[in-house]
């Protein structure tokens, strides 16, 4: 991966995403290892992690449900969608279901303003959602995750 980027610092975000996909979250050990390999301080790595909402230092569920509540989504029902997901999954912001299948996050923007309200589950976008539509989305992931 290093050969595709001009500097070691520029490979940090893709490397963090790869490590997180492999391990499930960015543990202290992963952060230390990446900092050493990329010749960065652990503080440099942690600063980048804290900036991006898709990166986490805590274990998440198999499916990370990110509900956008920025202005476009908010005006079209994003907050109500978040509340609906909280009730449906039985968890709140930054929570994980007891079976480890779902995590839920409120996020500021996922770049899908034209299709608001929108939710991102892992790397998949779901747009123009209603409570009924998000129920179907969550049920589909639930079935897939239990197979």
Residue locations for each model-derived region?
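Signature of N-terminal electron-transfer/Fe-S-associated modules in redox systems
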Residues: 1-147
């Amino acid at each position: 991966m290093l050969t595709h980027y001009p500097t070691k610092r520029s490979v940090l975000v893709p490397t963090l995403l790869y490590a997180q996909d492999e391990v499930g979250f960015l543990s202290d050990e992963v952060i230390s290892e990446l900092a050493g390999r990329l010749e960065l301080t652990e503080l440099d790595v942690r600063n980048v992690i804290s900036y991006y909402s898709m990166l986490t230092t805590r274990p998440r569920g198999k499916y990370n449900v990110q509900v956008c509540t920025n202005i476009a989504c908010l005006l079209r029902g994003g907050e109500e969608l978040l509340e609906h997901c909280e009730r449906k999954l039985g968890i709140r912001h930054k929570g994980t279901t007891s079976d480890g299948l779902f995590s839920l996050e409120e996020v500021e923007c996922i770049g899908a303003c034209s299709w608001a309200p929108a939710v991102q589950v892992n790397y998949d976008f779901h747009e123009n959602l209603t409570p009924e539509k998000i129920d179907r989305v969550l049920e589909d992931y639930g079935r897939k995750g239990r197979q």
